[in-house]
Amino acid sequence: EYEAYDVKSGVAGGGIAGYPGPAGPPGPPGPPGTSGHPGAPGAPGYQGPPGEPGQAGPAGPPGPPGAIGPSGKDGESGRPGRPGPRGFPGPPGMKGPAGMPGFPGMKGHRGFDGRNGEKGEPGAPGLKGENGVPGEDGAPGPMGPRGAPGERGRPGLPGAAGARGNDGARGSDGQPGPPGPPGTAGFPGSPGAKGEVGPAGSPGSSGAPGQRGEPGPQGHAGAPGPPGPPGSDGSPGGKGEMGPAGIPGAPGLIGARGPPGPPGTNGVPGQRGAAGEPGKNGAKGDPGPRGERGEAGSPGIAGPKGEDGKDGSPGEPGANGLPGAAGERGVPGFRGPAGANGLPGEKGPPGDRGGPGPAGPRGVAGEPGRNGLPGGPGLRGIPGSPGGPGSNGKPGPPGSQGETGRPGPPGSPGPRGQPGVMGFPGPKGNDGAPGKNGERGGPGGPGPQGPAGKNGETGPQGPPGPTGPSGDKGDTGPPGPQGLQGLPGTSGPPGENGKPGEPGPKGEAGAPGIPGGKGDSGAPGERGPPGAGGPPGPRGGAGPPGPEGGKGAAGPPGPPGSAGTPGLQGMPGERGGPGGPGPKGDKGEPGSSGVDGAPGKDGPRGPTGPIGPPGPAGQPGDKGESGAPGVPGIAGPRGGPGERGEQGPPGPAGFPGAPGQNGEPGAKGERGAPGEKGEGGPPGAAGPAGGSGPAGPPGPQGVKGERGSPGGPGAAGFPGGRGPPGPPGSNGNPGPPGSSGAPGKDGPPGPPGSNGAPGSPGISGPKGDSGPPGERGAPGPQGPPGAPGPLGIAGLTGARGLAGPPGMPGARGSPGPQGIKGENGKPGPSGQNGERGPPGPQGLPGLAGTAGEPGRDGNPGSDGLPGRDGAPGAKGDRGENGSPGAPGAPGHPGPPGPVGPAGKSGDRGETGPAGPSGAPGPAGSRGPPGPQGPRGDKGETGERGAMGIKGHRGFPGNPGAPGSPGPAGHQGAVGSPGPAGPRGPVGPSGPPGKDGASGHPGPIGPPGPRGNRGERGSEGSPGHPGQPGPPGPPGAPGPCCGAGGVAAI
C-alpha cells in the first residue's frame, strides 16, 4: 500500500492536485482577407439626345483629327483670292502705366484682449484629518482578468524530521464534513521505508497537547495534471501586411458624341452708315484699374524703327491717399479658382525615417468584397495627364477584437507562446483515508527554517478615500510628441469682402519664362457688335520674302458667293520672267472674267507714272469664294508699339469664366519677414470632448504581493515642492473636428515681404494651337495685405486636377492692340523679261461702280478646282473712314454651336473709327479647337494715332463674383515645425472633458519589492465545541498493573 504526503501537513494523505497545465499556444492568425472582385467594366454610354437649340450646353471635347485625304492633283494657277479675314489680335501691348494707389481701407475694431489668468498662491497645508471609522469590508469586486501564472517556486530544502510531539488528548469527534469534490489522482508515491519496531515503552502520562510540527519534506510531485483551460488570446499580433491590390476595373467606354445642334443662321449684313465727322479729342477719362501683370510673351522679331510720337501732356500729380482705418475682418471668402499650373518645385530633402509604430490589434479576416456595380455611361472626357503619386491615406480605425475561432484540427507545434494566464485553482481533492498512526519516534532536533509562505490573497477593495486638497500647478512639461493629424475641420462661413488695401511694392521682374506649349484653339466666340473703325495707320514697308511653303490641304467647301461688282480696270503690269515649268494640273472651272486690261506692249518697263486722283469708293462686293489656304510665310518684323488711345467708358461686366486648371506648384520662395503680432482675437469656443477609445484587451494579472502591515496614520506633511516635468504623454486618439471659432479681427498690416527669387525657367513645351483671345475679367478690389505668417511646411506636389467643365463663352471684349505686322506673301513665279516700254500716260480717275445687291447665303458648294493665276489687279483707292458705330450691349452668351467648317475668306472691311473701349470682361471658357482658317491677306498699315490725354483716376470696380471652389488638394506630408510664435495670453479655462474610456492595459510590470512581514493577527475567538466524534477502536491491552487493572488511555 502506497501513501502520499500532504504537502502542507507532511502527513500522509490524499494525492495533491496537479499543477495547471501550460497555457495553450496562441491560435494561428486568420487568413488575409481576399481582395475584392474587380468592378465590372462600365457599360458603353448611351447616345445623348440631340441638344435643343438655344440652351447653353458646355462645349464638347475636340473631336479626333480627321484622316488625311489623298494628295490633290496640282491645279492650275487660280485667280488672286480676296483679302482674308482679320487676323487674331497680336501679342499684348506694352505695359500700361501704373494705376494710382487705391483708397486705404477703414481701420477695424480692436479685438477683445484675452485676460491672463493669475497664478494662484499655494494653499495652506491642510489640517490633519481624524482617522475615519474603518469601513466595512465591501463586497468583493468583479473578478479581474486572469493573471499570468507566477513562476514556479523552487522546492524548499527538506526539513529535518521534527521531534514527535506528545500525543494530545483525544478530541471530541467532529461532525463529518461534506464530501469534497473528487481530486485528481496523483501518481502513487514511492514506498516509504518501513520503520523499525521500537521497544515497547512504558506508558507515559498524558502530556499536554503537542504543537503542530514543522512542515515535513515535500512529497514527490504528482503526475502532471490534465491540460489546463486554454490560455487567453495572446497579445495582438503585428499589423498584417496589406493585401494585394484588387484588379482595377476596365475603363468605361467613351460615350458616343451627341449630334450637333442646328447651326445658327447668318445675319443679314447691315447697311453701311454715312461717314461721320472726324472725332474730337474726348474729355479726360478716368484711368482704368491697374491690369494684372501679363505673362512675358515670346520675343518677336525686331521691327523697323517707329516714328517719334508727339510729346504727351504732363500728367497731373496724384493726390495723397487718406490714411484708412483697418477694415473689419470679413468672413472667409469663397475659395478662389485654382491657379495655373506652375513649374515643378525642387525636390525636398528626404524626411527623417519614422520610428516603428505600435503594433495594431489583431485584424479580422476580411470578407470578400462585393462585385462592383456596373459603371454608368462614361462621359467622353479629355484625356488627362497621368496623376502624381497619391498621398498616404489616413490611418484607418483600429479593427475590432476578433472572435474566438473554433478549435481547429491539431496543427504542428506553433512558436512558443507568451506566458499564459494563471489558471484557476483546481477542485479540492477528496479527503484521503485516515492515515495510520506512526510509531512514536524520539524527539528530533530543531529543524531549519522552512521556505517562505505563500503570499496572502488580496483583500476586497475598500471604500474610496476622501478627496485630497488640490495641489499646486506643476511646471509645464516638455512638449509631447507631435500628435496625429486631426480630422479636417468644418468650413467656416464665407467672409465679407475685404476693403481695398494699398498696393504692395512692385516685385522684381521674374526671369523670362520659356514659351509654353501650344494650347488648343478655342471655340469661336459670338460675333459682337461692329466696333468703330480706328484711324488708318501708316503703311508699313515691304518685308523680306518668305520661303516658299508646301502646299496646304484643301479646306472644306464653302457656300458659293454671288458675283461681285467688276473692279476698276487695272494698269497693265510688266511682264514677268519665265517661270519654271510646273506639273500640268487639271483644268479648272473658268472663273468670272474681269474687265480686260489694256494690253501693253511687251517692251522695257518705263518709269512709273504719277498716281491719278482717287476715284469714289465702290460699294463692297459680295463675298467671293475662298481660295485654298496658302502656306504661311515667315513672320514679318514686329511693328513699333502704338500710342495709347483714349480710354472709353467702362462696359458692362462680363460673365464669370470657369475656373482654370490647377497649376504646377511653383518653386519655393524665400522666407518672408516675420509678421507683426496681431491683436488677440476673442477666445474660441471649446471643442467637443474626444470620444472614448476602444477598450483594450485585458492585461495579464500581476504577481500577488504579500500583505503588508497596517501603518499608523501619518502626520500631515508640508506641501511638497514642484516636481520635475513629467515625461511627454502618449498621443491621444484624434478627436472629432472642433467647431469653427469666431473669426478673429484683422491684425495690422505686416511689413512687405522680401521679393522672391526669380523662378527658374520652365521646360519648353510643345507649341499649342492658338485659342481665341479671352476677355479680360473685371478686376476685383485689392484686399488688404495680411501679415505674413510663419514659414509653412512644404507640402507634397499635388496631383494635377482634372480639367473643369468649360464655362459659357464670355462676351466679346474691347478691340485688342495693334497686331503684329502680317507675314509677307510668297514670291510669285518670275516672269519673262519683256521689252522696255515707254512710260504710260497718267490714268483718269475711275468711275464709281454700281452697288451690288446683297448676296444671300448660298448652300455650300463642292470645292472647285483651283483656277489659274489671274493678272494682278491695280491697288484700289483707300476708302473713306466710316462713322463710329454705337457700342452695342453685350448679348447673352448663346450655347456653343458645333464646330463648323472653315469659313470663306471675306473681303476686308474698311477701317472704321475707334469705338469706345468696353470694360474688360471675364475670361471666357476654353472652347474646342476650331479648324484652321485660311490665311488672310496682309492688311495695310494704319496711320499712327495721336497720343491720348491722361485720364482721371477711375473708381474702384465692383468686387468680382466668387469663383467656384477648386478641387481639394491631396494631403501634404507633415512638414517641419515652424518657428515658435510669441506666447499668447492664457485663455479661459475650458469645460472639463468627459471621462475617457479605459485605456489599454499596460504590459506586465516587474514584480514589486517584497512587502514587510505582516504583524501577527489577533488571536481568534475560541471556536464552538465540536460534536462528539464516533467512538474509536478499542485500545491495545496495556500492561497489567494488577488484577482487574484497566488499560491506560
UniProtKB/Swiss-Prot annotation:
Keywords: Collagen, Disulfide bond, Extracellular matrix, Glycoprotein, Hydroxylation, Repeat, Secreted. Residues 234-243, 372-393, 513-522, 539-555, 573-583, 680-694, 708-721 have a biased composition (Gly residues). GO terms for cellular component: collagen trimer; extracellular region. It comes from the Eukaryota. PANTHER family: COLLAGEN ALPHA, COLLAGEN TRIPLE HELIX REPEAT. Trimers of identical alpha 1(III) chains. The chains are linked to each other by interchain disulfide bonds. Trimers are also cross-linked via hydroxylysines. Interacts with ADGRG1. This is Collagen alpha-1(III) chain. It comes from Bos taurus. The lineage of its organism: Eukaryota, Metazoa, Chordata, Craniata, Vertebrata.
